[in-house]
Protein backbone atom coordinates (compact mmCIF):
# COMPACT_ATOMS: atom_id res chain seq x y z
CA UNK A 1 0.00 0.00 0.00
CA UNK A 2 1.34 3.42 -1.00
CA UNK A 3 2.11 5.77 1.89
CA UNK A 4 2.97 9.31 0.70
CA UNK A 5 6.08 11.04 2.01
CA UNK A 6 5.33 12.74 5.32
CA UNK A 7 7.33 15.84 4.35
CA UNK A 8 5.75 16.29 0.91
CA UNK A 9 4.48 19.81 1.57
CA UNK A 10 7.58 21.19 3.27
CA UNK A 11 9.72 22.01 0.23
CA UNK A 12 7.26 22.68 -2.59
CA UNK A 13 6.51 26.27 -3.58
CA UNK A 14 2.79 27.00 -3.98
CA UNK A 15 1.62 30.03 -5.96
CA UNK A 16 -1.74 31.79 -6.01
CA UNK A 17 -3.83 31.20 -9.12
CA UNK A 18 -4.84 34.66 -10.31
CA UNK A 19 -6.99 36.40 -7.73
CA UNK A 20 -8.62 33.18 -6.54
CA UNK A 21 -8.13 31.31 -3.29
CA UNK A 22 -6.47 28.40 -5.10
CA UNK A 23 -2.78 27.63 -4.61
CA UNK A 24 -1.02 25.45 -7.19
CA UNK A 25 2.46 23.93 -7.02
CA UNK A 26 5.09 25.78 -9.03
CA UNK A 27 5.58 22.56 -10.99
CA UNK A 28 2.56 20.47 -11.99
CA UNK A 29 2.45 17.09 -13.74
CA UNK A 30 0.76 16.70 -17.11
CA UNK A 31 -0.44 13.33 -18.37
CA UNK A 32 -0.46 14.30 -22.07
CA UNK A 33 2.25 11.74 -22.82
CA UNK A 34 3.36 8.53 -21.08
CA UNK A 35 0.02 7.59 -19.57
CA UNK A 36 -1.52 5.76 -22.51
CA UNK A 37 -1.37 2.13 -23.55
CA UNK A 38 2.29 2.34 -24.67
CA UNK A 39 3.68 3.07 -21.18
CA UNK A 40 3.94 0.33 -18.53
CA UNK A 41 1.46 0.79 -15.70
CA UNK A 42 4.24 0.45 -13.13
CA UNK A 43 6.11 3.39 -14.69
CA UNK A 44 2.99 5.54 -14.64
CA UNK A 45 2.53 4.71 -10.96
CA UNK A 46 6.15 5.64 -10.20
CA UNK A 47 5.71 9.02 -11.92
CA UNK A 48 2.56 9.88 -9.98
CA UNK A 49 3.96 8.75 -6.64
CA UNK A 50 7.24 10.61 -7.16
CA UNK A 51 5.37 13.79 -8.05
CA UNK A 52 3.07 13.65 -5.03
CA UNK A 53 5.94 12.82 -2.68
CA UNK A 54 7.61 16.04 -3.88
CA UNK A 55 4.49 18.11 -3.15
CA UNK A 56 3.07 18.16 -6.68
CA UNK A 57 -0.65 18.12 -6.02
CA UNK A 58 -1.88 19.06 -9.50
CA UNK A 59 -2.32 16.41 -12.21
CA UNK A 60 -3.60 17.56 -15.60
CA UNK A 61 -5.43 15.45 -18.20
CA UNK A 62 -7.71 15.77 -21.22
CA UNK A 63 -10.40 13.53 -22.63
CA UNK A 64 -8.32 12.51 -25.67
CA UNK A 65 -4.94 11.92 -24.01
CA UNK A 66 -3.66 8.45 -24.75
CA UNK A 67 -3.14 6.64 -27.01
CA UNK A 68 -5.84 5.60 -27.61
CA UNK A 69 -8.19 8.47 -26.80
CA UNK A 70 -9.35 8.30 -23.20
CA UNK A 71 -6.62 5.91 -22.10
CA UNK A 72 -4.74 8.41 -19.90
CA UNK A 73 -7.93 9.16 -17.96
CA UNK A 74 -8.74 5.45 -17.78
CA UNK A 75 -5.30 4.58 -16.46
CA UNK A 76 -5.40 7.47 -14.02
CA UNK A 77 -8.71 6.12 -12.73
CA UNK A 78 -7.02 2.82 -11.94
CA UNK A 79 -4.22 4.64 -10.12
CA UNK A 80 -6.86 6.70 -8.31
CA UNK A 81 -8.56 3.58 -7.01
CA UNK A 82 -5.28 1.98 -5.94
CA UNK A 83 -3.34 4.90 -4.44
CA UNK A 84 -5.31 8.11 -4.23
CA UNK A 85 -8.88 7.38 -3.12
CA UNK A 86 -8.02 8.39 0.45
CA UNK A 87 -6.13 11.50 -0.74
CA UNK A 88 -8.69 13.00 -3.16
CA UNK A 89 -9.00 16.18 -1.12
CA UNK A 90 -5.23 16.73 -1.39
CA UNK A 91 -5.28 16.55 -5.18
CA UNK A 92 -6.13 19.23 -7.73
CA UNK A 93 -7.28 17.42 -10.88
CA UNK A 94 -8.11 18.88 -14.26
CA UNK A 95 -9.35 17.60 -17.58
CA UNK A 96 -10.44 19.16 -20.86
CA UNK A 97 -12.57 18.77 -23.96
CA UNK A 98 -12.43 20.58 -27.27
CA UNK A 99 -10.50 18.43 -29.69
CA UNK A 100 -11.59 15.32 -31.59
CA UNK A 101 -12.71 12.57 -29.21
CA UNK A 102 -15.38 10.35 -30.80
CA UNK A 103 -16.99 9.89 -34.21
CA UNK A 104 -19.80 12.04 -35.51
CA UNK A 105 -20.73 15.72 -35.20
CA UNK A 106 -20.99 15.73 -31.38
CA UNK A 107 -17.49 14.50 -30.49
CA UNK A 108 -15.42 17.62 -31.15
CA UNK A 109 -15.17 21.40 -30.75
CA UNK A 110 -17.27 23.50 -28.35
CA UNK A 111 -20.98 22.69 -28.33
CA UNK A 112 -22.87 22.28 -25.08
CA UNK A 113 -23.77 18.73 -26.12
CA UNK A 114 -20.12 17.73 -26.61
CA UNK A 115 -18.81 19.33 -23.42
CA UNK A 116 -21.52 17.93 -21.15
CA UNK A 117 -21.15 14.43 -22.60
CA UNK A 118 -17.38 14.67 -22.35
CA UNK A 119 -17.23 15.60 -18.66
CA UNK A 120 -19.60 12.73 -17.84
CA UNK A 121 -17.36 10.28 -19.69
CA UNK A 122 -14.20 11.70 -18.11
CA UNK A 123 -15.51 11.35 -14.56
CA UNK A 124 -16.33 7.69 -15.18
CA UNK A 125 -12.89 6.97 -16.63
CA UNK A 126 -11.10 8.83 -13.84
CA UNK A 127 -13.14 7.20 -11.03
CA UNK A 128 -13.92 10.56 -9.41
CA UNK A 129 -17.13 12.42 -8.61
CA UNK A 130 -15.77 15.76 -9.82
CA UNK A 131 -12.67 17.43 -11.23
CA UNK A 132 -11.25 20.60 -9.80
CA UNK A 133 -10.96 22.33 -13.19
CA UNK A 134 -12.71 21.59 -16.46
CA UNK A 135 -11.28 23.38 -19.49
CA UNK A 136 -12.51 24.14 -22.94
CA UNK A 137 -9.44 22.87 -24.78
CA UNK A 138 -9.46 25.26 -27.76
CA UNK A 139 -11.56 28.04 -29.29
CA UNK A 140 -14.34 26.98 -31.65
CA UNK A 141 -15.18 29.64 -34.24
CA UNK A 142 -18.34 27.76 -35.25
CA UNK A 143 -19.95 27.80 -31.80
CA UNK A 144 -21.05 31.02 -30.06
CA UNK A 145 -18.78 31.73 -27.14
CA UNK A 146 -21.91 32.16 -25.01
CA UNK A 147 -22.84 28.51 -25.65
CA UNK A 148 -19.38 27.18 -24.84
CA UNK A 149 -18.94 29.25 -21.70
CA UNK A 150 -22.54 28.48 -20.75
CA UNK A 151 -21.67 24.79 -20.85
CA UNK A 152 -18.69 25.36 -18.54
CA UNK A 153 -20.96 27.30 -16.18
CA UNK A 154 -23.50 24.46 -16.21
CA UNK A 155 -20.78 21.89 -15.48
CA UNK A 156 -19.57 23.87 -12.46
CA UNK A 157 -23.10 24.49 -11.15
CA UNK A 158 -23.89 20.79 -11.47
CA UNK A 159 -20.93 19.92 -9.22
CA UNK A 160 -19.01 18.05 -11.89
CA UNK A 161 -16.18 20.61 -11.70
CA UNK A 162 -15.27 23.19 -9.08
CA UNK A 163 -13.77 25.71 -11.50
CA UNK A 164 -13.83 26.57 -15.20
CA UNK A 165 -10.80 27.15 -17.39
CA UNK A 166 -9.84 27.81 -21.00
CA UNK A 167 -6.87 26.55 -23.00
CA UNK A 168 -5.22 27.65 -26.25
CA UNK A 169 -7.17 30.91 -26.44
CA UNK A 170 -4.23 32.92 -27.79
CA UNK A 171 -6.12 35.88 -29.24
CA UNK A 172 -6.24 38.36 -26.33
CA UNK A 173 -9.65 39.73 -27.35
CA UNK A 174 -11.13 36.25 -27.66
CA UNK A 175 -9.72 35.21 -24.29
CA UNK A 176 -11.10 38.37 -22.70
CA UNK A 177 -14.55 37.70 -24.17
CA UNK A 178 -14.56 34.17 -22.75
CA UNK A 179 -13.35 35.33 -19.34
CA UNK A 180 -15.93 38.11 -19.14
CA UNK A 181 -18.75 35.84 -20.28
CA UNK A 182 -17.92 33.37 -17.52
CA UNK A 183 -17.86 36.20 -15.00
CA UNK A 184 -21.24 37.44 -16.25
CA UNK A 185 -22.64 33.96 -15.73
CA UNK A 186 -21.31 33.90 -12.16
CA UNK A 187 -18.61 31.27 -12.72
CA UNK A 188 -15.32 33.18 -12.94
CA UNK A 189 -12.59 31.72 -15.14
CA UNK A 190 -9.95 30.35 -12.79
CA UNK A 191 -7.13 29.64 -15.21
CA UNK A 192 -5.84 29.69 -18.78
CA UNK A 193 -3.56 26.95 -20.10
CA UNK A 194 -1.43 28.12 -23.06
CA UNK A 195 1.75 26.85 -24.70
CA UNK A 196 4.59 28.97 -23.29
CA UNK A 197 8.32 28.45 -23.31
CA UNK A 198 11.61 30.10 -24.20
CA UNK A 199 10.94 28.96 -27.77
CA UNK A 200 7.29 30.10 -27.88
CA UNK A 201 6.60 33.51 -26.36
CA UNK A 202 3.32 34.18 -28.18
CA UNK A 203 1.33 34.82 -25.00
CA UNK A 204 3.47 37.88 -24.25
CA UNK A 205 1.75 39.63 -27.19
CA UNK A 206 -1.21 40.79 -25.13
CA UNK A 207 -2.57 37.62 -23.54
CA UNK A 208 -0.63 37.84 -20.27
CA UNK A 209 -1.81 41.45 -19.95
CA UNK A 210 -5.43 40.26 -20.19
CA UNK A 211 -4.89 37.51 -17.63
CA UNK A 212 -3.22 39.91 -15.24
CA UNK A 213 -5.97 42.51 -15.64
CA UNK A 214 -8.78 39.98 -15.24
CA UNK A 215 -7.17 38.14 -12.32
CA UNK A 216 -6.97 34.81 -14.14
CA UNK A 217 -4.21 32.32 -13.40
CA UNK A 218 -1.97 30.80 -16.04
CA UNK A 219 -0.43 27.33 -16.26
CA UNK A 220 2.11 26.94 -19.05
CA UNK A 221 2.08 23.68 -20.97
CA UNK A 222 5.14 22.47 -22.92
CA UNK A 223 7.51 24.76 -20.96
CA UNK A 224 10.36 22.52 -22.15
CA UNK A 225 9.15 22.70 -25.78
CA UNK A 226 8.41 18.97 -25.92
CA UNK A 227 11.96 18.14 -24.89
CA UNK A 228 13.89 20.62 -27.02
CA UNK A 229 14.77 22.62 -23.91
CA UNK A 230 16.31 19.63 -22.18
CA UNK A 231 19.22 19.73 -24.64
CA UNK A 232 18.72 16.09 -25.61
CA UNK A 233 18.60 16.92 -29.33
CA UNK A 234 21.76 19.03 -29.53
CA UNK A 235 23.89 16.08 -30.64
CA UNK A 236 21.36 14.36 -32.86
CA UNK A 237 18.09 12.52 -32.36
CA UNK A 238 18.23 9.83 -29.65
CA UNK A 239 16.74 6.50 -30.70
CA UNK A 240 14.44 6.41 -27.68
CA UNK A 241 13.22 9.99 -28.10
CA UNK A 242 9.64 11.10 -28.66
CA UNK A 243 10.65 12.49 -32.05
CA UNK A 244 11.41 8.92 -33.14
CA UNK A 245 8.58 7.17 -31.28
CA UNK A 246 5.82 9.69 -32.04
CA UNK A 247 6.57 12.61 -34.34
CA UNK A 248 3.13 14.19 -34.21
CA UNK A 249 4.02 16.89 -31.69
CA UNK A 250 7.76 17.27 -32.23
CA UNK A 251 8.92 17.10 -35.82
CA UNK A 252 12.44 16.88 -37.17
CA UNK A 253 12.12 20.24 -38.92
CA UNK A 254 12.18 21.89 -35.48
CA UNK A 255 15.90 21.05 -35.34
CA UNK A 256 16.90 23.86 -37.68
CA UNK A 257 20.31 25.54 -37.21
CA UNK A 258 18.83 28.75 -35.77
CA UNK A 259 16.85 26.90 -33.09
CA UNK A 260 19.79 24.68 -32.18
CA UNK A 261 22.05 27.72 -31.82
CA UNK A 262 19.48 29.36 -29.53
CA UNK A 263 19.32 26.24 -27.39
CA UNK A 264 23.12 26.05 -27.19
CA UNK A 265 23.22 29.66 -26.03
CA UNK A 266 20.59 28.99 -23.38
CA UNK A 267 22.47 25.92 -22.22
CA UNK A 268 25.55 28.08 -21.70
CA UNK A 269 23.54 30.45 -19.49
CA UNK A 270 22.24 27.49 -17.50
CA UNK A 271 25.69 25.97 -17.03
CA UNK A 272 27.07 29.29 -15.80
CA UNK A 273 24.30 29.29 -13.18
CA UNK A 274 24.98 25.69 -12.18
CA UNK A 275 21.64 24.52 -13.58
CA UNK A 276 20.43 22.12 -16.21
CA UNK A 277 18.89 23.67 -19.31
CA UNK A 278 15.49 22.30 -18.27
CA UNK A 279 15.74 23.94 -14.85
CA UNK A 280 16.59 27.29 -16.44
CA UNK A 281 13.67 26.98 -18.86
CA UNK A 282 11.23 26.28 -16.03
CA UNK A 283 12.57 29.03 -13.83
CA UNK A 284 12.27 31.51 -16.70
CA UNK A 285 8.62 30.59 -17.36
CA UNK A 286 7.87 31.18 -13.67
CA UNK A 287 9.77 34.48 -13.42
CA UNK A 288 6.47 36.43 -13.60
CA UNK A 289 3.81 35.72 -10.96
CA UNK A 290 1.18 35.88 -13.72
CA UNK A 291 2.24 32.31 -14.53
CA UNK A 292 1.00 30.20 -11.63
CA UNK A 293 2.57 26.87 -12.57
CA UNK A 294 4.70 25.13 -15.19
CA UNK A 295 3.14 21.92 -16.48
CA UNK A 296 5.78 19.30 -17.14
CA UNK A 297 5.63 15.83 -18.63
CA UNK A 298 7.99 13.05 -17.65
CA UNK A 299 8.94 9.56 -18.75
CA UNK A 300 11.14 8.79 -15.71
CA UNK A 301 10.81 9.72 -12.02
CA UNK A 302 14.29 11.28 -11.94
CA UNK A 303 13.16 13.87 -14.49
CA UNK A 304 10.54 15.10 -12.05
CA UNK A 305 13.07 15.26 -9.22
CA UNK A 306 15.50 17.28 -11.34
CA UNK A 307 12.85 19.66 -12.67
CA UNK A 308 11.48 20.49 -9.22
CA UNK A 309 14.94 21.82 -8.29
CA UNK A 310 14.22 24.79 -10.57
CA UNK A 311 12.04 26.19 -7.79
CA UNK A 312 15.01 26.47 -5.42
CA UNK A 313 17.43 28.28 -7.75
CA UNK A 314 18.52 31.89 -7.14
CA UNK A 315 16.44 34.46 -9.07
CA UNK A 316 17.51 35.29 -12.59
CA UNK A 317 19.45 38.55 -12.68
CA UNK A 318 18.56 41.42 -14.98
CA UNK A 319 21.72 40.74 -16.99
CA UNK A 320 20.77 37.07 -17.38
CA UNK A 321 17.25 37.97 -18.45
CA UNK A 322 18.65 40.32 -21.08
CA UNK A 323 20.93 37.57 -22.40
CA UNK A 324 17.98 35.21 -22.58
CA UNK A 325 15.89 37.83 -24.39
CA UNK A 326 18.70 38.23 -26.89
CA UNK A 327 18.52 34.53 -27.64
CA UNK A 328 14.75 34.11 -27.70
CA UNK A 329 12.82 37.35 -28.19
Regions found by a protein language model. Give the residues of each.
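A short, structured active-site edge motif that brings together acidic residues
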Residues: 88-101, 193-195
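Alpha-helix N-cap and loop-to-helix initiation/capping positions
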Residues: 39-43, 71, 75, 106-114, ...
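Active-site groove signature of glycoside hydrolases
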Residues: 123-143
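N-terminal binding-site loop/beta-alpha segment at the start of enzyme catalytic domains
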Residues: 1-91, 157
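Short, well-ordered coil/turn segments that N-cap beta-strands
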Residues: 22-27, 55-57, 85-91, 128-132, ...
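N-terminal small/glycine-rich loop or linker at the start of catalytic domains
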Residues: 18-36, 94-107, 130, 135
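Beta/alpha (TIM)-barrel catalytic core signal, keyed to glycine-rich beta->alpha loops juxtaposed to Asp/Glu
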Residues: 2-11, 139-328
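Short, acidic/polar
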Residues: 39-51, 110-126, 175-179
Amino acid sequence: MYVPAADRYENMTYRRCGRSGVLLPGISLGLWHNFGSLTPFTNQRALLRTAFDLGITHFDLANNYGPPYGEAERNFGLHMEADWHTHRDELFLSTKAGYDMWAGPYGDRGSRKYLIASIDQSLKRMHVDYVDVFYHHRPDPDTPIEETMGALDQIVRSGKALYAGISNYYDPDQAERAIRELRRLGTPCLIHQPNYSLLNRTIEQGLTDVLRKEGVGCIAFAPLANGLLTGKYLDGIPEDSRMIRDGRYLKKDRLDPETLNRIRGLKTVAEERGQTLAQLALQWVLRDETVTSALIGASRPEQIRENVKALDAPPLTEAELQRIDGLTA
